Amino acid sequence: MATSKSGGSSKNGRDSISKRLGVKRSGGQFVKAEEIIVRQRGTKFHKGRNVGLGRDYTLFALSSGKVEFKTLKGKKYVNII
């Protein structure tokens, strides 16, 4: 028979790994074709000229050029110029 009570287990101590989301290339920065510009959940940023949209909503460059961020009618767009 145990002489002392068993210790309680903690309900803390869990954390999910970070998903490394966010803007990867800033405005005015030069990018090559197929470079990732934004990693996001949903369309926080919308695709503009020469920008592709992946199935996980990742924005990537379709051609080489400079990154441009624009806001039109309350929506943020990413273009390559």
Swiss-Prot record:
GO terms for biological process: translation. Residues 1-11 have a biased composition (Polar residues). One of its GO terms (cellular component) is cytosolic large ribosomal subunit. GO terms for molecular function: structural constituent of ribosome. Residues 1-23 are annotated as: Disordered. It holds the Pfam family Ribosomal_L27. Keywords: Ribonucleoprotein, Ribosomal protein. NCBIfam families: L27. Belongs to the bacterial ribosomal protein bL27 family. This is Large ribosomal subunit protein bL27. It comes from Borrelia garinii subsp. bavariensis (strain ATCC BAA-2496 / DSM 23469 / PBi) (Borreliella bavariensis). The lineage of its organism: Bacteria, Pseudomonadati, Spirochaetota, Spirochaetia, Spirochaetales. The gene is rpmA.
